[in-house]
């Protein structure tokens, strides 16, 4: 095994196998993610792109080229975040696989022109590393191809684009552009011994000499130019504080990385410290000075700043640094190093002086050089102009119409005689084609146009005549001054004299000509006379001037379409605005009428006029020269009111809503008259909803006038009209709960009106024309009461700790009629508060004196249409019933939350209540009606009916139980035949038998006759239980037998003789049927189950002595009947119906005697 593993080939193949498997897994994942990118949301796309980047570029870089196009296609995505994620992917690609630069660089250039500033900033950030990696990659290529050359061209284009962005409007883009240019300057310059060293640094020293794409010198020159631009930008007066701090930091980094630029940077910092931009605020100045101090401290630590240490120290002292702090920053150097640097400083200074002197000499030489006209260049320009003019003319001379027109145009201008020059230069045309003639004529005219510098060829001439340095031939003269020929000296003297004479002559002529011109000018001044318009014109009549004015304004107004087509509609609107605001009333009213003719399309013009009036009112713009006796705000108020009235009268409903809303929301100020008009508009049925909504929005959007608009809504919240009241209260809730606008004022108003109810009669403050109740009323009406507490009830769910307490106080002190009104209005606010409101639960638990009815009503509301009441509510109600309120009605709302034992214990008290309340109770218990159908009880209908029968009659009147059972049996949908069978089956098992059992049996038999056989069996079981011992049940037994005859006759024969005698005595009508049945039985032979002679005698009516040994006669007295022990626990219920008094039970008659010694009926032994 070791030998196998030791083989390198095997290890290599195994590694390749695992690598291939890893790549395949990664490829499958990336394919799935790329498929999801098509339909994913923007946020999901960003997550998927991050996963692709992590997988492809993090662990499987060989997949980068395969999925590159899929990712780059998202560069056109509409979402900004997705495009930024693509930029991050491209940046990482250029770090991991820089050879893919030609494939991605076009996308970078495209995204640099994106519409989103965020994307542009992200691209600029990425371009820093992309440019560095790309430059290193291109330098490493031995033979760069076309793709590499194209990539370098695009990189250069990107560099130029970012350089232009240093003047971008966006502050963040400028900051990122500065940081990018910082990197470019560092990359395109040489490092020296003092440069700050970093990992992966790149400088011009790394650019190979054989690189064909770019040269060191060119890159260095470009880097120097970019540094100059940064220095210039750093010194501008309009630079922002953010850009200034960023530029300062970048220049400091450049100086640290390339100390060769240290002098320029220190000089820039010195200028900045002396002259901070005037646009900065005090806090910005402090930030800039703090940043400058920090950058200077950083520079001072660098060895390359040794030459400028004194300058930096001076600036740091000025910026607040102490001498000790500065001394700690200076790097430590030995004496040799300091001497070497001092020597280098002197050498640099000497070189600088020599260079400066050399430049001064060159400049002086250039100034001393004489210039002359460059005739060769001038001739070359003339020839080029002639060719251009000749070509132009030849194209036009080919058209006969042009030639004819030209001849006819200039024919009258020909001289009478042929000029001599024409005769000298003219050559007759012999045997030339038309093309040759056109060429010849075009050349001739072209030369003339060039002489005059006319035609299209005039563009070839330079603006100034071409000049060149005058060439002076060097004449070597070895003659000394003594050897100069006298004739030559005399000749030179004569030439110089003639030259001076000519110059004097020209000067004299010029002075004479100037003197003549001055004389002419003075004579012209003498003849000139000032022209006065008033002396040569007459004033127009006033009416005519006004007519001209109105006609001119009307023409301006009617030129609307022409101005729109010409693109000057904004200038026309400005002109009309100024005219309307500054001209007399007749012009103003005319413009107003023009606007109102089509207010929907001309509303912008109206707003321009409105704002112009506002500017005049506030003194922001020119003042009108029209004299008026009105108040300063009259023009503005009049215009605004006319706009509002015009919109209301001339627009349809839809446009009226939109335009009125715009006017009120966009008007600079709203006078009281306009607010009053809005109040009147809100009283209109069609506009009331939109008007109140507008008032609410004005309260939110116009904080200075919020008190006024809230007061308007408060007035509407107590208006007589219900629709206005509801809308106003809803908007006040929004201001109160959502926007938190004047909550204290709203609380004060609501509580003030709530307390009006405590008074015996409505106060005068309730009645006003503003509230829709102009006439006072002596007594409270239900509507007036609801108006007073309506706002308080609306705000109750949002501040229950305040309003619930006040409502309780008012409820206690008010009259019974007003209490009923309050109870009927509690539903909506209590339901909004909910059963979990701690304030409500605390009120139920405390239940102050006099608040019982209110608390009961609250419990009813909280339990409406709820399957099962809240446990906390049930607990509070149970405690309330046990400790404070001993009225069982308090338990009614929470019946569905009680246990079975609690229901059984409280049932006797419930059925003794008012019939209406008892009906409601059984509707709840049985789930009758839509209101209670969803409730779930702990007892079934069967249990309820059985519980009613087992109620102790000493605790509850028998009549109440009878009524309760009747209510149950009336619900045939619930108490079906099967349910009643179950009830009777349970009742027959009860000991002693329930008093109303036989009554229920008879009612069940009446409802469902098919129960006859079941009842027969039931009667037999009753005989076994000696039914005759309970008189009421015995009577019911006999009535049941009567109903079931003749089928029930066998039941009578099972009775003991004494009870049979009693039955026949109480029900004589049974005797014939029984006799008939007995005779039918006599035909059968006697057997053990036959009819005895004693029974036959009883049936026939013969006298038979029947002995009864029990003195009770077989009946059990009421006091000896076994009773169920009552449950001591009681549960409370709430109702607004009064309780009926309990009925007094009827006395029980004495029992009838019976013989206990009689033999048992057949089958009982």
Swiss-Prot record:
Coiled coil keyword on record: yes
Region entry Disordered, spans: 365-384
Each HEAT repeat, start to end: 23-58, 61-95, 98-140, 147-186, 218-257
Changes seen on gene knockout: RNAi-mediated knockdown results in overproliferation of testicular cystocytes undergoing transit amplification leading to increased incidence of spermatogonial tumors.
Gene Ontology molecular function, alphabetical: RNA binding
Domain of life: Eukaryota
Listed InterPro entries: ARM-like, ARM-type_fold, Symplekin/Pta1, Symplekin/Pta1_N, Symplekin_C
GO cellular component: histone locus body; mRNA cleavage and polyadenylation specificity factor complex; nucleus; tricellular tight junction
Subcellular location: Nucleus
GO terms classed as biological process: co-transcriptional mRNA 3'-end processing, cleavage and polyadenylation pathway; mRNA 3'-end processing by stem-loop binding and cleavage
Keyword flag RNA-binding: yes
Its job: Component of a protein complex required for cotranscriptional processing of 3'-ends of polyadenylated and histone pre-mRNA. Involved in germline stem cell transit amplification, differentiation and mitosis-to-meiosis transition.
Oligomer and partners: Interacts with Cpsf73 and Cpsf100 forming a core cleavage factor required for both polyadenylated and histone mRNA processing. Interacts with Slbp and Lsm11.
PANTHER family: SYMPLEKIN, SYMPLEKIN-RELATED
Family as reported in the entry's similarity comment: Belongs to the Symplekin family.
Name used for this protein in its record: Symplekin
Taxonomy of the source species: Eukaryota, Metazoa, Ecdysozoa, Arthropoda, Hexapoda
Gene responsible for this protein: Sym
């Amino acid at each position: 095994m070791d030998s196998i593993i030791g083989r390198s080939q095997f290890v290599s193949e195994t590694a390749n196998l695992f690598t291939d498997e890893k790549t395949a897994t990664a490829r499958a994942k990336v394919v799935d993610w790329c498929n999801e990118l098509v339909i994913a949301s923007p946020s999901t796309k960003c997550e998927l792109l991050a996963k692709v980047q992590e997988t492809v570029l993090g662990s499987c870089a060989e997949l980068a080229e395969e999925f590159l196009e899929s990712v780059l296609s998202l560069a056109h995505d509409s979402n900004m975040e997705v495009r930024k994620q693509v930029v991050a992917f491209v940046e990482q690609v250029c770090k991991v696989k820089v050879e893919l630069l030609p494939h991605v660089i076009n996308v970078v250039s495209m995204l640099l022109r994106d519409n989103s500033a965020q994307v542009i900033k992200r691209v600029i950030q990425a371009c820093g590393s992309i440019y560095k990696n790309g430059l290193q990659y291109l330098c490493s290529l031995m033979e760069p191809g076309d793709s590499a050359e194209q990539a370098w061209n695009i990189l250069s284009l990107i560099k130029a684009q970012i350089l232009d962005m240093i003047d971008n409007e966006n502050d963040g883009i400028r900051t990122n552009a500065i940081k990018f240019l910082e990197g470019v300057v560092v990359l395109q310059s040489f490092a020296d011994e003092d440069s700050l060293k970093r990992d992966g640094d790149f400088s011009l020293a790394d650019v190979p000499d054989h690189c064909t794409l770019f040269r060191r010198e060119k890159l260095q020159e470009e880097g120097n130019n970019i540094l100059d631009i940064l220095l210039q930008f750093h010194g501008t007066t309009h630079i922002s504080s953010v850009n200034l701090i960023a530029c300062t930091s970048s220049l400091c980094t450049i100086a640290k990385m390339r100390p060769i630029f240290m002098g320029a940077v220190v000089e820039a910092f010195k200028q900045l410290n002396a002259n901070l931009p005037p646009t900065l605020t005090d806090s910005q100045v402090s930030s800039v000075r703090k940043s400058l101090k920090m950058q200077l401290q950083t520079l001072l630590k660098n060895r390359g700043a040794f030459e400028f240490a004194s300058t930096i120290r001076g600036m740091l002292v000025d910026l607040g640094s102490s001498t000790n702090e500065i001394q700690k920053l200076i790097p430590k150097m030995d004496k040799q190093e300091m001497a070497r640097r001092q020597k280098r400083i002197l050498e640099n200074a000497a070189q600088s002086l020599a260079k400066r002197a050399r430049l001064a000499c060159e400049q002086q030489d250039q100034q001393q050089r004489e210039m002359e006209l460059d005739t060769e260049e001038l001739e070359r320009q003339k020839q080029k102009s002639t060719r251009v003019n000749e070509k132009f003319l030849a194209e036009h001379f080919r058209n006969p119409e042009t030639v004819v027109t030209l001849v006819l145009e200039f024919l009258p201008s020909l001289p009478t005689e042929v000029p001599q020059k024409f005769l000298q230069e003219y050559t007759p045309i012999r045997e030339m084609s038309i093309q040759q003639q056109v060429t010849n004529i075009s050349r001739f005219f072209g030369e003339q146009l060039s002489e005059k510098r006319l035609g299209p060829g005039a563009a070839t001439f330079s603006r100034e005549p071409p000049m060149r340095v005058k060439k002076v031939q060097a004449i070597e003269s070895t003659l000394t001054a003594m050897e100069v020929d006298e004739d030559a000296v005399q000749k030179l003297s004569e030439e110089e004299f003639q030259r001076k004479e000519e110059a004097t002559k020209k000067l004299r002529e010029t002075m004479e000509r100037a003197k003549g011109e001055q004389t002419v000018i003075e004579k012209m001044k003498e003849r000139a006379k000032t022209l006065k318009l008033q002396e040569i014109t007459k004033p127009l009549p006033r009416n005519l001037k006004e007519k001209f004015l109105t006609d001119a304004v009307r023409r301006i107004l009617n030129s609307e379409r022409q101005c729109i087509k010409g693109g000057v509609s904004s200038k026309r609107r400005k002109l009309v605005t100024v005219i309307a605001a500054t001209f007399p009333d007749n012009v103003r009213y005319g413009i107003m009428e023009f606007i109102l003719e089509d207010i929907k399309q001309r509303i912008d013009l109206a707003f321009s006029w409105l704002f112009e009036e506002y500017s005049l009112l506030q003194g922001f713009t020119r003042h009108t020269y029209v004299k008026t006796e009105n108040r300063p705000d009259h023009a503005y108020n009049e215009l605004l009111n006319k706009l509002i009235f015009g919109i209301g009268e001339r627009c349809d409903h839809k446009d009226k809503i939109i335009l009125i809303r715009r006017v009120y929301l966009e008007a600079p100020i709203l006078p009281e008259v306009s607010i009053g008009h809005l109040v009147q508009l809100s009283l209109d049925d069609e506009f009331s909803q939109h008007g109140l909504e507008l008032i609410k929005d004005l309260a939110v959007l116009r904080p200075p006038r919020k008190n006024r608009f809230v007061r308007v809504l408060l007035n509407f919240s107590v208006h007589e009209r219900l629709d206005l009241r509801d809308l106003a209260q809803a908007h006040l809730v929004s201001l109160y709960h959502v926007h938190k606008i004047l909550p204290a004022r709203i609380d004060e108003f609501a509580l003030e009106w709530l307390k009006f109810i405590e008074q015996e009669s409505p106060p005068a403050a309730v009645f006003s024309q503003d509230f829709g109740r102009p006439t006072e009323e002596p007594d409270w009406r239900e509507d007036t009461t609801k108006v007073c507490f309506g706002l308080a009830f609306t705000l109750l769910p949002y501040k229950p700790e305040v309003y619930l307490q006040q409502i309780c106080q008012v409820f206690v002190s008010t009259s019974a009629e007003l209490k009923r009104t309050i109870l009927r209005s509690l539903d909506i606010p209590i339901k909004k508060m909910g059963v979990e409101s701690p304030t409500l639960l605390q009120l139920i638990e405390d239940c102050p004196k006099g608040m019982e009815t209110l608390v009961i009503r609250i419990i009813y509301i909280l339990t409406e249409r709820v399957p099962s009441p809240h446990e906390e509510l049930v607990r509070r109600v149970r405690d309330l019933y046990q400790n404070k309120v001993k009225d069982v009605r308090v338990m009614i709302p929470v019946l569905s939350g009680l246990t079975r034992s609690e229901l059984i214990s409280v049932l006797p008290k419930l059925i003794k209540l008012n019939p209406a309340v008892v009906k409601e109770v059984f509707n709840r218990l049985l789930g009758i009606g839509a209101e209670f159908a969803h409730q779930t009880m702990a007892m079934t209908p069967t249990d309820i009916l059985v519980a009613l029968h087992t109620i102790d009659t000493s605790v509850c009147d028998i009549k109440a139980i009878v009524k309760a059972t009747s209510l149950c049996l009336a619900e045939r949908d619930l108490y079906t035949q099967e349910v009643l069978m179950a009830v009777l089956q349970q009742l027959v098992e009860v000991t002693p038998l329930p008093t109303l059992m036989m009554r229920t049996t008879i009612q069940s038999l009446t409802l469902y006759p098919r129960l006859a056989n079941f009842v027969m069996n039931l009667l037999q079981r009753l005989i076994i239980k000696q039914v005759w011992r309970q008189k009421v049940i015995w009577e019911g037994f006999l009535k049941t037998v009567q109903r079931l005859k003749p089928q029930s006759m066998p039941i009578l024969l099972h009775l003991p003789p004494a009870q049979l005698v009693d039955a026949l005595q109480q029900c004589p009508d049974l005797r014939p049927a029984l006799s008939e049945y007995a005779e039918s039985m006599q035909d059968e032979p006697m057997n053990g189950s036959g009819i005895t002679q004693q029974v036959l005698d009883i049936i026939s009516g013969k006298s038979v002595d029947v002995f009864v040994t029990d003195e009770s006669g077989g009946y059990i007295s009421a006091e000896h009947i076994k009773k169920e022990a009552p449950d001591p626990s009681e549960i409370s219920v709430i109702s607004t119906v009064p309780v009926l008094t309990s009925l007094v039970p009827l006395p029980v008659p004495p029992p009838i005697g019976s013989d206990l010694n009689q033999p048992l009926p057949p089958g009982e032994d």
